[in-house]
């Protein structure tokens, strides 16, 4: 009875948006990358809310969005599904005060992060005929991290984007992570992973 009551409460709160559904999390998202089905980057849109600060001043903060749950990173590259920071989505980042050796090391790490992101999305979306899935895969396949900073759309917000801001994809007027078909793909993958690692509450 207690577990049923807790489950009902959880589902009610999730439906109201007061907590994230299982397999999803609320994350700070700063930019949206609009892409077409061929994977071309069409525009970069800032996603900031204006909030009141101290002494009557206002400031801009990233929007909070419900996206596929963030992975736990320890060492190595581990990408998030349909959102992440510039190292994973664009394969590039910026850091002040680096010498040449440090910069080269970071660039190599960024490339590995991007490759991890591309591999994750291919493993999840390969063979699917959904337009949004094709758009994301085409973007990741044709994007060249080495030329990211030369892209005029990225350059508009280079300082903010490349300093660790999180971003999502937009396709055909909507956020890709909100696409019902891709959300279903994530739900199934998350449920399968949970089944593989889950424990019984009674037996452990």
Where are these regions (language model features)?
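Conserved phosphate-interacting/catalytic interface
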Residues: 1-198, 204
């Amino acid at each position: 009875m207690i577990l049923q009551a807790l489950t009902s409460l959880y589902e009610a709160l999730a439906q109201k948006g007061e907590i994230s559904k299982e397999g999803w999390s609320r994350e700070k998202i700063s930019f949206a990358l609009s892409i077409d089905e061929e994977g071309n980057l069409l525009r970069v849109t800032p996603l900031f809310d204006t909030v009141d600060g101290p002494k009557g001043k206002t400031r801009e903060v990233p929007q909070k969005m419900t996206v596929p749950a963030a992975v736990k990173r320890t060492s190595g590259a581990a990408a998030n599904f349909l959102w992440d920071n510039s190292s994973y989505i664009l394969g590039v980042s910026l850091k002040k005060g680096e010498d040449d050796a440090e910069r080269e090391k970071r660039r190599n790490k960024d490339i590995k992060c991007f490759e991890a992101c591309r591999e994750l999305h291919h493993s999840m979306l390969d063979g699917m005929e959904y337009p949004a899935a094709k758009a994301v895969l085409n973007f990741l396949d044709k994007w060249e991290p080495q030329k990211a900073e030369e892209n005029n759309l990225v350059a508009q917000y280079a300082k903010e984007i490349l300093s660790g801001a999180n971003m999502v994809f937009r396709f055909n007027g909507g956020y890709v992570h909100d696409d019902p078909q891709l959300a279903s793909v994530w739900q199934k993958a998350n449920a399968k992973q949970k089944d593989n690692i889950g424990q019984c509450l009674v037996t452990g």
